[in-house]
Structure formats: structure tokens, C-alpha cells
């Protein structure tokens, strides 16, 4: 019979109490504490190797005499996932300890560095000004862990990573704690500051479960009680360390309920700590009461949800036991007896900041508000250059010209191009101004091609929104798309290497040739061979990837040589094939694609996609039927661009899909994609060998598009 507890064991309550621990909840610890210890050791080693600021030694980290923090807070994690999430948790500890000593603005910058590192990773070791940048070091530090998590469980890993960034790093310093007057207000803030939502996503990843939004809503009251106990437990046991640190910091920020009670109620330290202790016990009892009510109201809970609820309490208790014994909160006492080993500057010792006194009314630097991280976008410099010639007519407003541009740019994006730029930059180390210029060039060309593609394909939707030409009309959209090509040329001329402009023109020519064949086959109802199709893809899709890689190669100050350029071209060629065939496959397979562009939209367009080409060549008997459908569709569309005439009937699409599935074409296309994915991975290895640098960032890009977990 399946039980609640699969991976953890009891901790003796009397033994725990003898250490000063006073939790009222049962304590459990993961059986594989050794995995958590190894992950902590690796996290500390990697921080020292990649970041190299010494903080891995100054932070208390996750170890303790009674067990690893990861083994207590992830008690029911699958063993093969425990190491990854403990690594991330220990990284959070080091990062948190570091930020506690930084002035407010520097702490914000440090959060931003780590948040960016969680987006992609870095793997560069070459010595240059860019390689020494802290954000690049952080990317290198975190990359292998992120890649490992994605290889274990890509969907949950991405959810966990995004939550870690957006629900913790991007909000943790965003409020002035000294403005708060009530415990409820403080706990609401600490829920964000402590990253509770991000933490539960890590628990879900570890347990390999998915808790729905509805289930989270129903369990929220009891989880909120447990979270309050968790936060206050940390405050209780960390108070002495935080108070001592604040006396030695130029810009002290105490985020602790003990200080809240001292400040708002005029209590002494001992009185305030005792009040926090009482509240911890109260919230633990509240959790137990609400849990029993929840079970009574929901007697037929699925096992995974009951396990999740029980784990919540065990995490609360395990964290308490660890906090009562961990070096992170208590090692400072040893430092007091060994002044020579202190990691703090002795010059500030004994200085008490009046802002930390009970009842102090002065506002700390926490009153400064953090601004959300924003991605740099195209600046106004992309408009027409001002002409200082009185003999030339004054230019009209560019509002009408730029409206379609701004519309397509505002659409949601999966960020693949930005990820690819980051990945290539781990090898090429392009200086930031030129790198930003190249990003803008690629964005211009990509968005221009989207506008034109939608017009040429008569697509009504783009990323779930009305296509640009359906909002602004075909003529205006074409005009704006053409102007974006002009802007791209203007920006390329400003790059340092003169070869960049020739590269741009070469790849644009290639792109238009590829697109011409795609349109030609559709209009003339001709079926290309697989070889002809791949040649078209190499031109149309591969051109954009090659252009990006070549522009960055030309602007790189650390990489040169024809061999490297050839390897980059080969990787981009394979990546372009993988990307395009995957797009063809997902258009017919993916629910997400249907939501974004419409069900099997490629069939509406009469597009010669890879699966369809394979079907038409391998099953001549069905060729006449499908070509007849396309011929009739083309005839209907030519009578007028009405939505009824441009869309195939749903039944017709389902019939074509039945032919594709019945002929095993979708399965063979998936096999082709997996072969291409392996080939791209092999080409990345070739570049890593040639450049002498591993690049897990590029593998993360590939992993985000992986079809290894796709099943038919």
C-alpha cells in the first residue's frame, strides 16, 4: 500500500528538544542526507570557482550537525532531484547572506545579476573585461544546475526557475520594512521577501507533482499558517546574527519580526523574542487545526495532495530543527572567540546605528524602491536621422510608419533569439554596445519577416493576437516591414567590422530566395522533394541563425579563424533545420500552437510542410486527395479574402490529420527531429572542443526546444 512517507524518516522529538528546538510539529528528514551534503559541497565549490568572491566560505550554507537543510525542507523529494534543489537552496543562502551586508542599491544589483543568471547560464573562462563581469560569473555558476534540472523534468524545471526569479529575486528588496506597523503586514511582505511561492515550486519539482491553482487556493489557509511559522522561526533563530551584522554594516537593513516588535511595541530584545516564540507555536497549532478541517471537508483527497499537505508541516518542523542548530545562524559565536578569523571589518565593530534602536523613526535605505528589471528595447535612434539641411523638406511624423512596428514588437515572445544571443556570447564575448546593436538588428529583421509572412500566408493570428495586417491593413504593414529592413541596414553600417554589412546582405538574399521557393510551391501546388525542402530551410530559416552568429563572430575580440566560423555555420544550419521541422510538426500536433495561430493553420495556408511532403511522396494514392483539397482551397481564397473562404473546414483538417497519423508520418517526423536534435548537440560539442570552453547555455537553448519528451 502506498504511504504518505516514501523518502524520509522520523527524528526523535526528545533529541530535538534537547538542542533548544521547540517546534510542536513532528520532524522528519530525507533518508539520503548524503545527497544533500554532496550538493551543498558542490554548490560551495562552484561558487568559489566561478564567482570567486569568497562568500562561499563566509556563508553558513546548508550544513548542520543534525542534518542538511535540503534534507529537512525537501523531505519527500525523489532522490535523483534532491541534489538539484538543494544546490539551488544553498545558492540562495549564500546569495542572501551576501546581500545582507550590501547597501540597498548594491543588493538590488546583486538580485538582478542572479535573476539574469537564472534566465540563461554562462560558461566562459577567458580573461577579458567582459569575462570578469559579475553577471557573467553568476551565469557560469548556475548553468550546470539549471541544465541538470531541465534534463530531469523540463516542464517543472522551467516553472521552478521562472518562479525562483520572478517570485523571489525580482521582489525580495522591494519594500521598506520599517514602514510596517503590524505582524500581518510584515508576514505578507516576508512571504515575497522569503520567496515562499518560489519555494513551493521547488517542492513540487522535487516530489514530481503538479498542484493546480484550484488546489492551491483551497489549501492556502493552512499553508499560510505554516509559512508564517517558517518565517518567524527563521527570524527567531537568526536574530542574534542579524543584529550583530547590522552593527557592522554601513547601510543596515534588519528584516526580522523581533525588530518589528521592538520598534512598534517598545519591547526589549528578550521580550520581543519571546513574543516571536509564542507566535511560532500559535501558527503551528493553526496549521494543525486548519489541516484537520480541510481533511474533514475533503475526505476523498487524492494521495498526492494529502502528501503535499503533510509535507508542508514536516518542512516547517524540519526547518525549525535545522535553524536551532545550523552554523549559518550560530557560527558567529565562534567568531567572537576567534577575532583573527572574522570575515568582517574590525573598523566598524561596536558601532550602533540609531536606525536600529527600538522605536527609531528614521527611515532606512529600504525606503528606496526597486525598479523592475526591464529588457533593453529599440531606442528612438531607430527612426529617421534628423537632417540639418534647410534646403530639404521637413519630414512628417513617423507615427503611421512605426505603428505596425510597435504593434508586432509588443506581442509576447518566447525569447528564443535572446537566449541564442546569450548562448553564442559565452563563446564570442562581444562587447555590450555591439551586442545590443546586433540584438536590435536581428529583432528588426525577425519582426519584419513575421509581418510579411503573415500577409503572404494570409494568417489571421500571430501569437494569439490579430496579425499585424489585420489591424493596420496589408499596404501599411508591408511599408513598415520594408522600413525595418532599412533600419537594419543602417544599424549594421554602424558596427565596427566592415564585413558585417556584406554578411547582412548575403544572408538577406539567402532568406528571400528560401522564402520564394516556399511561396512558389504553395502557389503552383508543387510538392518538393525532401532534399529541396531542406535546401529551402537552410536558406529561409538557417539564414537568420547564421546572420546572428556571423555578426557576433565579426564583432568578437577573442575568437577568429575560418574553422570556428565553419563550425558555427554548421551548427546554425542544423539548428535551422531542427527549428523549422519542429515548427511544422508542432503546428499539426501542439495544442499551444493551435491556441496561438489556429488549429493546423499550415493546412489552411496550403503550406508544403515537412510532414505533408513526406506523406505526399510516400503515399501516392492519397496525393490526389490532398492536392485536390488544396486546389479547391486556393480557388475559394482567390474569390475574396473572407475568413470563411480562407479557412479549411474543421472536418477537412481532421481528415488530413487522420491520413498523417495513419501513415505513421507524424511518428517518422518525430524520429527525424530527434536525429536532428542529436546532430545539433554533437555540433555544439564540436564547437566546445574547438574553442576549449563548455557551453551549457547553448545546451539549455536546445533543451527548451527538445522533443525528447514528446509522445504521440
Curated annotation (Swiss-Prot):
Gene3D superfamilies: Farnesyl Diphosphate Synthase. Residues 1-332 are annotated as: Terpene cyclase. Isopentenyl diphosphate binds at residues 414, 417, 446, 463. Its EC number is 4.2.3.-, 2.5.1.29, 2.5.1.81. Keywords: Isoprene biosynthesis, Lyase, Magnesium, Metal-binding, Multifunctional enzyme, Repeat, Transferase. GO terms for molecular function: lyase activity; metal ion binding; prenyltransferase activity. The keyword Magnesium applies. Substrate binds at residues 96, 234, 238-242, 328-329. Mg(2+) 2 binds at residue 96. Pfam families: polyprenyl_synt, Terpene_syn_C_2. A motif (NSE/DTE) lies at residues 234-242. Mg(2+) 4 binds at residues 453, 457. InterPro entries: Isoprenoid_synthase_dom_sf (IPR008949), Polyprenyl_synt (IPR000092), Polyprenyl_synt_CS (IPR033749). Mg(2+) 1 binds at residue 96. Residues 333-706 are annotated as: Prenyltransferase. Its cofactor is Mg(2+). GO terms for biological process: alcohol biosynthetic process; mycotoxin biosynthetic process; terpenoid biosynthetic process. The conserved DDXXD motifs as well as the NSE/DTE motif are important for the catalytic activity, presumably through binding to Mg(2+). Bifunctional terpene synthase; part of the gene cluster that mediates the biosynthesis of betaestacins. The bifunctional terpene synthase btcA converts isopentenyl diphosphate (IPP) and dimethylallyl diphosphate (DMAPP) into the sesterterpene betaestacin I. The C-terminal prenyltransferase (PT) domain of btcA catalyzes formation of GFPP, whereas the N-terminal terpene cyclase (TC) domain catalyzes the cyclization of GFPP into betaestacin I. In the N-terminal section; belongs to the terpene synthase family. In the C-terminal section; belongs to the FPP/GGPP synthase family. PANTHER family: GERANYLGERANYL PYROPHOSPHATE SYNTHASE, THIJ_PFPI FAMILY PROTEIN (AFU_ORTHOLOGUE AFUA_3G01210)-RELATED. Hexamer. This is Sesterterpene synthase btcA. The lineage of its organism: Eukaryota, Fungi, Dikarya, Ascomycota, Pezizomycotina. The gene is btcA.
Amino acid at each position: 500500500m502506498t504511504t504518505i512517507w516514501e523518502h524520509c524518516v522520523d527524528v526523535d522529538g526528545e533529541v530535538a528538544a534537547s538542542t533548544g528546538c521547540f517546534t510542536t510539529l513532528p520532524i522528519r528528514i530525507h533518508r539520503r542526507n548524503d545527497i544533500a551534503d554532496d550538493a551543498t559541497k558542490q554548490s560551495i565549490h562552484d561558487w568559489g570557482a566561478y564567482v570567486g568572491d569568497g562568500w562561499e566560505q563566509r556563508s553558513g550554507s546548508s550544513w548542520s550537525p543534525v542534518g542538511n537543510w535540503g534534507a529537512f525542507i525537501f523531505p519527500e523529494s525523489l532522490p535523483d532531484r534532491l541534489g538539484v534543489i538543494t544546490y539551488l537552496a544553498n545558492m540562495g543562502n549564500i546569495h542572501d547572506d551576501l546581500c545582507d551586508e550590501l547597501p540597498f542599491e548594491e543588493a538590488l544589483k546583486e538580485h538582478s545579476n542572479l535573476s539574469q543568471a537564472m534566465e540563461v547560464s554562462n560558461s566562459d573562462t577567458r580573461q577579458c573585461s567582459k569575462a570578469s563581469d559579475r553577471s557573467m560569473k553568476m551565469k557560469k555558476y548556475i548553468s550546470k544546475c539549471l541544465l541538470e534540472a531541465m534534463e530531469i523534468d523540463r516542464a517543472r524545471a522551467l516553472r521552478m526557475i521562472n518562479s525562483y526569479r520572478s517570485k523571489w529575486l525580482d521582489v525580495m528588496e522591494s519594500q521598506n520594512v520599517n514602514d510596517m506597523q503590524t505582524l500581518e503586514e510584515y508576514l505578507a511582505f516576508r512571504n515575497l521577501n522569503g520567496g515562499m511561492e518560489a519555494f513551493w515550486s521547488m517542492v513540487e519539482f522535487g516530489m514530481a507533482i503538479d498542484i493546480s491553482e484550484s488546489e492551491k487556493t483551497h489549501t492556502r489557509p493552512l499553508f499560510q499558517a505554516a509559512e508564517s511559522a517558517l518565517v518567524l522561526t527563521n527570524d527567531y533563530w537568526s536574530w542574534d546574527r542579524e543584529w550583530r551584522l547590522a552593527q557592522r554594516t554601513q547601510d543596515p537593513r534588519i528584516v526580522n519580526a523581533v525588530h518589528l516588535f521592538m520598534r512598534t511595541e517598545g519591547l526589549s530584545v528578550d521580550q520581543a523574542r519571546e513574543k516571536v516564540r509564542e507566535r511560532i507555536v500559535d501558527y503551528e497549532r493553526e496549521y494543525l487545526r486548519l489541516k484537520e478541517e480541510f481533511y474533514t471537508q475533503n475526505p476523498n483527497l487524492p494521495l498526492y495532495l494529502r502528501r503535499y499537505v503533510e509535507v508542508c508541516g514536516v518542512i516547517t518542523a524540519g526547518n525549525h530543527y535545522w535553524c536551532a542548530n545550523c552554523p549559518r545562524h550560530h557560527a558567529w559565536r565562534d567568531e567572537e572567540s576567534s577575532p583573527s578569523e572574522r570575515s568582517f571589518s574590525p573598523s566598524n565593530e561596536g558601532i550602533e546605528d540609531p536606525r536600529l534602536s527600538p522605536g527609531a523613526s528614521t527611515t532606512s535605505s529600504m525606503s528606496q524602491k526597486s525598479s523592475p528589471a526591464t529588457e533593453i528595447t529599440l531606442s528612438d535612434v531607430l527612426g529617421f536621422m534628423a537632417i540639418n539641411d534647410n534646403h530639404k523638406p521637413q519630414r512628417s511624423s513617423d507615427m503611421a510608419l512605426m505603428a505596425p512596428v510597435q504593434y508586432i514588437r509588443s506581442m509576447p515572445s518566447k525569447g528564443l533569439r535572446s537566449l541564442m544571443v546569450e548562448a553564442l556570447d559565452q563563446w564570442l564575448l562581444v562587447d555590450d554596445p555591439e551586442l545590443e546593436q546586433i540584438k536590435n538588428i536581428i529583432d528588426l529583421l525577425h519582426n519584419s519577416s513575421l509581418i510579411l509572412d503573415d500577409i503572404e500566408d494570409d494568417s489571421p493570428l500571430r501569437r494569439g493576437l490579430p496579425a499585424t495586417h489585420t489591424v493596420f491593413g496589408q499596404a501599411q504593414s508591408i511599408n513598415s516591414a520594408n522600413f525595418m529592413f532599412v533600419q537594419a541596414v543602417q544599424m549594421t553600417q554602424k558596427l565596427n567590422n566592415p564585413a558585417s554589412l556584406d554578411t547582412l546582405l548575403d544572408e538577406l538574399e539567402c532568406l528571400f530566395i528560401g522564402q520564394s521557393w516556399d511561396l512558389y510551391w504553395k502557389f503552383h501546388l508543387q510538392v518538393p522533394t525532401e532534399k529541396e525542402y531542406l535546401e529551402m530551410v537552410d536558406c529561409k530559416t538557417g539564414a537568420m541563425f547564421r546572420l546572428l552568429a556571423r555578426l557576433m563572430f565579426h564583432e568578437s575580440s577573442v575568437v577568429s579563424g575560418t574553422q570556428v566560423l565553419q563550425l558555427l555555420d554548421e551548427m546554425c544550419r542544423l539548428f535551422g533545420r531542427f527549428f523549422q521541422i519542429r515548427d511544422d510538426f508542432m503546428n499539426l500536433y501542439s495544442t499551444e500552437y493551435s491556441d496561438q495561430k489556429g488549429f493546423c493553420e499550415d493546412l489552411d495556408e496550403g503550406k508544403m510542410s515537412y510532414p505533408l511532403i513526406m506523406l505526399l511522396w510516400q503515399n501516392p494514392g492519397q496525393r490526389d486527395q490532398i492536392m485536390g483539397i488544396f486546389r479547391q482551397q486556393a480557388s475559394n481564397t482567390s474569390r475574396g479574402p473572407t475568413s470563411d473562404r480562407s479557412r479549411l473546414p474543421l472536418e477537412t483538417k481532421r481528415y488530413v490529420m487522420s491520413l498523417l497519423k495513419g501513415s505513421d508520418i507524424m511518428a517518422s517526423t518525430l524520429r527525424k527531429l530527434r536525429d536532428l536534435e542529436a546532430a545539433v548537440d554533437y555540433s555544439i560539442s564540436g564547437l566546445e572542443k574547438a574553442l576549449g570552453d563548455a557551453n551549457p547555455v547553448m545546451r539549455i537553448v536546445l533543451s527548451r526546444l527538445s522533443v525528447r519528451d514528446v509522445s504521440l
